Amino acid sequence: VDLDDQGERTFTFMVRPSADLFLVEEDLPQFAAGQWLHVCSIALSAEPSRSTTFAAMESIRSAGGRVSFDPNIRPDLWQDQALLLACLDRALHMANVVKLSEEELVFISSSNDLAYGIASVTERYQPELLLVTRGKAGVLAAFQQKFTHFNARPVASVDTTGAGDAFVAGLLASLAANGMPTDMTALEPTLTLAQTCGALATTAKGAMTALPYQRDLNRQF
């Protein structure tokens, strides 16, 4: 991971294939109603992990659980852009909750107009919840046919590595504990937690260094 003077990062992948891409269906647990499965497109970039991941998504949905999908697109891991688009399309159709970066929304929707892009993705894939993270500019949320902006939590950012993962961790912790919100107002505490986790993760160098513990979060509220 290389950082610029704003704490933004670029990635170089040194090991290919990595161990996680050898996941097979026999490795999957039995899923149950109420559980969550979180997936990124890196798991879809090669076999056997690709088939295993899609099988896991189908399995947990059949069991009454939900799927969270963060494309987390890393172009260096994909030799074939058509295959990337096909995998994204299939995964997005299976996801209950979708978290995109602004750049990923533009890529998937083929539009620089964020409002149009959100409407396009929502219409095509119909997720229960669509979130577009914009760093310091906050989060755009499409939920129950409504569209709202949530301000970011200001911090002194040192390293943005892992911020998206921390955001999703906070998001899923809240959704798993409390269930899907009933309306946009009820969604706000969930996104406050997610944004706090993401913001705190940027306050030290390293992907894991500043990931907050519950005690850290307790001091924020």
Curated annotation (Swiss-Prot):
Thylakoid is among the record's keywords: no
Keyword DNA-binding attached: no
Name the record gives this protein: Fructokinase
Name of the top EC class for this enzyme: transferase
Substrates-to-products reaction catalysed: D-fructose + ATP = D-fructose 6-phosphate + ADP + H(+)
Sequence similarity: Belongs to the carbohydrate kinase PfkB family.
Gene giving rise to this polypeptide: scrK
Matches recorded under InterPro entries: Carboh/pur_kinase_PfkB_CS (IPR002173), PfkB_Carbo_kinase (IPR050306), PfkB_dom (IPR011611), Ribokinase-like (IPR029056)
Keyword list, A-Z: ATP-binding, Carbohydrate metabolism, Kinase, Nucleotide-binding, Plasmid, Transferase
Documented EC number(s): 2.7.1.4
GO molecular function: ATP binding; fructokinase activity
One Pfam match: PfkB
Origin species: Salmonella thompson
Lineage: Bacteria, Pseudomonadati, Pseudomonadota, Gammaproteobacteria, Enterobacterales
